[in-house]
Regions:
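Conserved ASCE/P-loop NTPase catalytic core
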Residues: 2-263, 274-291, 299, 304-308
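Amphipathic alpha-helical interaction segments
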Residues: 56, 60, 83, 288-292, ...
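An accessory alpha-helical subdomain
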Residues: 308-316
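C-terminal engagement/docking regions of AAA+ P-loop ATPases
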Residues: 309, 329-382
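AAA+ ATPase "lid" subdomain C-terminal helix
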Residues: 67-71, 298-306, 318-339, 353, ...
């Protein structure tokens, strides 16, 4: 197999040099697919630091990427949905060329915007290009009820029209939204159900045809984007749901889950907990206490007073471990002890980490969040 010629990014500044280099443009989904294939062949893990998904979510995600699908991660809170999306950045090529000054990352060989067409028509092979790093090709938007079509797709900019003395019928007066600006990259919408239904409808054409429409302009922009969405399976927030035709257009829906055993949960907590070096020197924590803390989350997920539709985030055990260490550290400071252990009595200090991270059903509200937290610790110790 013939080895691909390595492109010298620092020596290519214009379209003519890019053509001479033999560079071939490819779609972002093709790019991610090719890099995933290399990663799998080299026996590397494309999702480093994601634990407990080795036989479930990661293979599903790899299959979706190989199929060049847009992806919806569906799962309860604290299941690493956004982290999975963010780690896809590493599957992009390190650098890609774009028309210099383009707002929508125009491919020099397949320009989209009027700006790029005009620049190429004017300068030809002398059209300046710049190399964009993969970290800048990732866009993310948290869906909130106030997000508008203009935010996502774009709108006419009357100030730009006035300053440039242009008619509203001129393409140059368009102010592009975050989706066109993420062209040739990965775009993530977190908590998709929180997006108003009419805004979700605006995404239909982008997902089906890959193009956008702005304020009645007869303009077709076939965007090149890998879309990743995250959502909760149950509408426990009462803010909305994913409209069926939109769900139908997202090719792969991947179900995430909580750790299936304490060992995996323990590894995640130890990886994510922010225990300071000074705390590690002063406070020792036994494996038994760590396991009791993990058991609190497992007990909560099956507890009759806790709303299972809401879920119990992995953030509970992370915050609880930090609080347990801080509780022992505080005791050591008060008694002028150089070193100490986390005792079972220190677990009272993890109650604030529990009460804010569990949603209670009606009976649980009657019992009270403090008492429910105490009962969960009590069951875990037993």
């Amino acid at each position: 197999m013939k080895k691909a010629k390595k492109i010298q990014y620092d020596s290519i500044y214009n379209l003519g040099q890019l053509k001479a280099s033999g560079y071939k443009s490819k779609s972002v989904k093709e790019e991610v697919r090719n890099n995933l294939i290399k990663t799998i062949q080299e026996k590397e893990n494309p999702f480093v630091g994601i634990m407990g998904y080795e036989d479930t979510v990661i293979p599903d995600t790899e299959r979706a990427i190989l199929s060049q699908h847009n992806i919806l991660f569906l799962g309860l809170r604290g299941q690493a949905k956004t982290r999975m999306a963010r780690q896809m950045i590493d599957l992009l090529d390190e650098y890609i060329p774009v028309i210099a000054g383009s707002e929508v990352n125009d491919d020099p060989f397949k320009p989209l915007s009027r700006y790029a067409y005009d620049l190429i028509a004017e300068k030809g092979d002398d059209t300046p290009i710049e190399w964009v790093h993969r970290t800048t090709r990732y866009g993310e938007k948290l869906a909130t009820p106030d997000v508008s079509v203009a935010d996502l797709i774009g709108d006419i900019d009357p100030i730009k029209a006035a300053n440039l003395k242009l008619s509203f019928s001129d393409e140059k007066v368009i102010h592009y939204g975050i989706i066109p600006r993420s062209n040739r990259g990965i775009f993530v919408i977190n908590e998709l159900p929180d997006l108003q239904a009419r805004i979700q409808v605006a995404l239909f054409n982008i997902l089906q045809e890959g193009d956008i429409q702005i304020r009645g302009f007869k303009l077709r922009m076939p965007l090149d984007i890998l879309f990743v969405f995250t959502a909760n399976p149950e509408d426990y927030t009462n803010r909305g749901s994913i409209v069926t035709p939109l769900k139908d257009r997202i090719e792969s829906q991947i179900l995430t889950h909580y750790p299936k055993n304490i060992e995996t949960s323990l590894a995640i907590t130890e990886q994510e907990a922010n225990i300071l070096p000074a705390q590690k020197e002063r406070v020792n924590i036994s494996d038994l206490v760590k396991r009791i803390i993990e058991q609190v989350a497992f007990e909560a997920r099956s507890n009759e007073y806790v709303d299972r539709k809401s879920g119990v985030s992995a953030r509970l055990t992370i915050a609880a471990l930090e609080n347990a260490v801080s509780s022992a550290e505080r005791r050591a400071i008060i008694h002028n002890e150089a070193n100490t252990q986390v005792w079972i009595s220190d677990l009272n200090g993890i109650i604030p980490a529990i009460t804010g991270k569990i949603e209670l059903v009606y009976e649980g509200e009657q019992e009270g969040p403090y008492q429910v937290a105490v009962n969960l610790i009590d069951k875990s110790v037993r």
